[in-house]
Amino acid sequence: IVLDTMNFWMDIMLDELKDTLKLIDVLTINDEEARQLSGEYSLVKAARKILKMGPKFLVVKKGEHGALLFNQQDDVFFAPALPLEEVFDPTGAGDSFAGGFIGFLASSGDISFDNMKRAIIYGSAMASFTVEKFGTERLLDLSQEEIDARINQFVDLVQFDISIADKA
């Protein structure tokens, strides 16, 4: 069970929201909502506090700066946002991220930490398409080939080799 909540519910139904957090697998919120819910400025401290409220995983969306994934074992994963030359409208990007993320998890049936990382990349890819036009209009004519190519762009962006042992 994935919950994508917002500050509105934190403002008017905080106790009910906290009760709900005990029943879910994944909470997705943005960085400001993480700070509001936890009372912590540091996102690492915020994540630890929120995870103690019940969810097994926490995804913190940071807009054009990517997303963070935390679990109750103190594992952390960071995925950058894809640098785009043309950004027309960020409206709906967070919802597209959540839809891509949840859709990937639902299609795989796997909620392991490693698969959550893949889901974050998939969600980030969907969000990157959304900002290319107004609203969610860009998603209407999207092909699987375009999605696969965008995901490969993410992989190319973050994949590198660093060998510290060779620097002696």
PLM regions with names:
Residues 1-49, 56, 66:
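Conserved beta-alpha-beta core of the PfkB/ribokinase-like small-molecule kinase fold
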Residues 44-168:
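Conserved phosphate-binding/catalytic region of the ribokinase-like
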